[in-house]
Each structure stands twice: as structure tokens, then as C-alpha cells.
Regions:
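Conduit-forming functional cores of very large proteins
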Residues: 292
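Cytoplasmic C-terminal tails of single-pass
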Residues: 304-322
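Membrane-proximal low-complexity regions enriched in glycine and acidic/polar residues
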Residues: 135-229
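Short beta-strand element of the conserved SAM-dependent methyltransferase core
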Residues: 71, 176-178, 235-237
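Solvent-exposed coil/turn segments that connect beta secondary-structure elements
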Residues: 47-49, 179-183, 234
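Extracellular or lumenal secretory-pathway regions
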Residues: 2-144, 239, 246-247, 254-281, ...
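Membrane-proximal extracellular "stem/stalk" segments
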Residues: 198-279
Length: 322
């Protein structure tokens, strides 16, 4: 191959590699930074020495509680832009005596994690509800500002405020906190005998359920993956005149160490993909592309030895030589 042809090949290769830089970043943002359609996971959070209303005696009891959460993806209902997952949350004692249960189905944007109202959305027995905010995760490259979530217990959007940066097992995370003051919990609450609330007289009395919630999320920001949670909940049953009240739940649910480790591994996998395809590949390709272009220019500017000799030999000597 002649020097000129080699220079042209190098120039073309360099231009191609430089063109790949924005294309690689676009590929990462479109195809890599997406939540999966398929999902099947189960996590647990445990509240030690919690106070709860025993469903048998209908009196406050103290013991460990377990909150179990299942996530199942509906692959056929999703597409390139949205995923559809079902979520079930069950609250029970260590003896598997169920105290509470919620179930919902929703769609969300696979890149931002924002809820999309479609695809048979429901929460418990309410099919008309329209949920909003983040679903199951933060957006990729989460920012240090507040985000909106949808609270299953309160059935309404709430704010998770950015609360600082914290290391979780050596990994930098952003901490977000939902602080919800005393608020009425929607739905019917079964009446209880008056004497259980310390009220005089006989018969049952109607009640309303109120909740105070402080929920903390630790989110790995690059992947948007929540890696740990602390769910502090206090629920109180109150009569209409507020003369009678009873603690229904006072607990602090913490993620298990095994679930924290699994979530950190998931976040690390996303980070590796993003680093490789979003930074290493473009930078490496860019440096190689620049090198090819520089080499091509150098070859084009450098004359061949024969041409240099021809320039140095006088014209009459060239004629005699011929």
C-alpha cells in the first residue's frame, strides 16, 4: 500500500472513531440506561420490638414484625419506553400472622422511573386511582433535589427531600427523606369495643386511622437504585371526638443486610456498564481517532525518499542521467 493510500485509510478510520463518540453516548442513554421489563424479586425489612395491634386480642402487643415486598414484571405489557410491574407488600409477625396487605400494578418510564398512567393500573381494589411520582426507583443520574413518590398507605403523592450524601458499605449514596406529619389514612376502619380504648359504657365505637411517617431512602445516584430503606411508621386509631385512642402500629422497618448487598451489586452492574460504554469507550475511541488523524497528516506531509532525492539533484544532471 502506498503512503498516500495508507494516510487516507488512517484519516477515514480516525474520522469514524471520532464520530462514534456522540453515537456511543446516545446508545448508552437510549439502550443501556433503562429499567428491565422482566422483574422478579422479593425483599424484606424487619422492625424489632415493634408495637402493633394484635388481631386476636385486639390489644397492643410488642414483638418483631416483617414487611415483605414482591415485585413482578409483566413483560408483555411493557415496551421500549415503559415497564409494567406489580407490587405486593405484606406486613406480618414473626409467626406469619398477617397484619396488613397492599397490592398495586403500575407502568413507569424505563429511563426516568416516573409513573405512567396506563396498562390496567390499580391500587388494592381501586382501579380508578391515578398514581404519580417515582415508581420503585429514582432516575439514572439522580440529582440532589426533592422527588415525588406515591405512598401506598396514604394513597397520595408525597415528597422525598434530598437530605445529604452518605456512604453505604463504601458506596456513595444520596439520602432522601419523606416526612409526613399526622394524616388520615383513607379507607374504612372496623369499630372496636369502647373498653379497649378506655372509654366508659358498652358497645363498639367508630374509629379513624391516622399515620405519621418518616421514610428514609439511600439511593446510589448513577444507577438510581435504592439500596437501603428505613421506614418509621406510627399509626393511631382515634374516635371522632378524639377522647379515645389506641396505638395500632409503632415500628421502624430496616432493610436486611442481604437485601442491601443485593441492591448494591445491582447498582454496581449499572455503574460498570455506564462507565465502560459512556466514558471509557468514547475516550479510548477519541484518543485512537485523534492518533489516526495525526498519523495521516504526518504521512501526507512527509515526502517519499525518491521525491526528496529528485528535488536535491540539479536538473541538468537529471537530464544527463536519463
Amino acid at each position: 500500500m502506498s503512503r498516500r493510500n495508507l494516510a487516507l485509510v488512517l484519516a477515514g478510520l480516525g474520522a469514524f472513531l471520532l464520530t462514534l463518540i456522540p453515537l456511543t453516548r446516545l446508545y448508552v442513554s437510549v439502550h443501556v440506561l433503562k429499567a428491565p421489563l422482566e422483574q422478579q424479586s422479593m425483599t424484606r425489612s424487619v422492625a424489632e420490638s415493634a408495637t402493633y395491634l394484635d388481631p386476636v386480642t385486639m390489644r397492643p402487643a410488642v414483638g418483631d414484625l416483617v414487611q415483605t415486598r414482591w415485585l413482578i414484571g409483566d413483560v408483555l405489557a411493557g415496551n421500549d419506553d415503559r415497564a409494567v410491574w406489580g407490587e405486593s407488600v405484606s406486613l406480618s409477625t414473626r409467626d406469619d400472622e398477617r397484619l396488613d396487605y397492599h397490592e398495586r400494578r403500575l407502568a413507569f418510564d424505563r429511563r426516568t422511573g416516573a409513573i405512567v398512567n396506563c396498562c390496567g393500573e390499580y391500587l388494592d381494589d381501586d382501579t380508578a386511582i391515578r398514581q404519580s411520582g417515582q415508581a420503585f426507583r429514582w432516575p439514572f443520574n439522580a440529582q440532589r433535589h426533592d422527588y415525588t413518590l406515591f405512598d401506598l398507605r396514604l394513597r397520595r403523592p408525597v415528597t422525598a427531600a434530598f437530605d445529604g450524601v452518605e456512604q453505604v458499605r463504601g458506596v456513595e449514596t444520596y439520602r432522601y427523606v419523606q416526612r409526613t406529619p399526622r394524616r388520615l389514612v383513607p379507607g374504612e376502619t372496623a369499630p372496636l369495643p369502647r373498653h379497649l380504648l378506655g372509654l366508659p359504657g358498652t358497645g363498639d365505637v367508630g374509629l379513624a386511622r391516622y399515620a405519621e411517617i418518616r421514610r428514609t431512602y439511600w439511593v446510589e445516584p448513577v444507577s438510581g437504585q435504592p439500596v437501603k430503606t428505613l421506614d418509621e411508621v406510627k399509626e393511631t386509631l382515634v374516635t371522632a371526638d378524639e377522647r379515645g385512642r389506641l396505638t395500632a402500629l409503632d415500628a421502624a422497618f430496616r432493610s436486611t443486610e442481604a437485601d442491601v448487598a443485593t441492591a448494591l451489586n445491582t447498582a454496581a452492574a449499572y455503574r460498570r456498564w455506564i462507565l465502560t460504554l459512556g466514558t471509557v469507550a468514547p475516550v479510548g475511541g477519541g484518543l485512537l481517532g485523534v492518533g489516526c488523524v495525526v498519523a495521516a497528516v504526518w504521512l501526507m506531509r512527509r515526502r517519499s525518499p525518491a521525491a526528496q532525492d529528485e528535488k536535491q539533484v540539479p536538473g541538468d544532471q537529471l537530464a544527463d542521467a536519463r
